[in-house]
Curated annotation (Swiss-Prot):
Primary localization: cytoplasm
Organism lineage string: Eukaryota, Viridiplantae, Streptophyta, Embryophyta, Tracheophyta
Protein's name according to its UniProt entry: Gamma-hordein-1
UniProt entry tagged with the keyword Iron: no
Record PANTHER family: GAMMA-GLIADIN (PTHR33454:SF16), PROLAMIN PPROL 14P (PTHR33454)
UniProt keyword annotation of Nucleotide-binding present: no
Cellular component GO terms, alphabetical: vacuole
Signal peptide: 1-19
Low complexity compositional bias, start-end: 27-54, 67-90
Amino acid sequence: MKILIILTILAMATTFATSEMQVNPSVQVQPTQQQPYPESQQPFISQSQQQFPQPQQPFPQQPQQPFPQSQQQCLQQPQHQFPQPTQQFPQRPLLPFTHPFLTFPDQLLPQPPHQSFPQPPQSYPQPPLQPFPQPPQQKYPEQPQQPFPWQQPTIQLYLQQQLNPCKEFLLQQCRPVSLLSYIWSKIVQQSSCRVMQQQCCLQLAQIPEQYKCTAIDSIVHAIFMQQGQRQGVQIVQQQPQPQQVGQCVLVQGQGVVQPQQLAQMEAIRTLVLQSVPSMCNFNVPPNCSTIKAPFVGVVTGVGGQ
């Protein structure tokens, strides 16, 4: 770009000088002392002399004057360096990012003072607490507490019902009792016998200590009554008070037992005392070994039915 501008200027100057010489041929130009060109212009003048051929007619050489200052400035103007695009522009100082939800302590907006509005004390009339109406409690007539079955006069009957598995175990085929020959017979059906044995032992374990003898007597009486019905023995049920019936005397009993049947009852008692304690781990007091039958009347006298 610079070379083009310089060549254009030189071409214009040469054309101007040639036209002036053709218009005034009488004017002789005296040679003047050549002044050295500036170093910056010498290569351009030599370049122009090489490109443009000199006219064959010698022309008087005009003194070459240096270009005016304005032209020199024009020639030197392209020599200025243009700003490079890589020049760094002044950077603005990075401001710290302010969070929109953060408040600056220096610029706190003045807040109006918190005004507490006076609340008028409203006391609503509260109705008096009335107790919840409860229905009148009806007192049911208290029934007299019945004594425990062990304390009832019907203890023998109760024990006979509870200890029925013991009677069935000793009387039936599990361990049949022959009241006539006092011997044991064979044992069959062990599975059902084991069930009756467990039930018998469970009932005996619930009997208090003071009623163990009564329990043994109940088992003996139940077996005796069962065998008496099978053998056709007549046992008359009576009231437990002593009474005079002909020549027979009832002693604290519920039935009448002939004297010849007393030995049979003793054999049953002996069998029960030998079987039940060892079978159920049932401790029998020593005084239970004697014959006590408060529920059976013993017949005394002769000829009583």
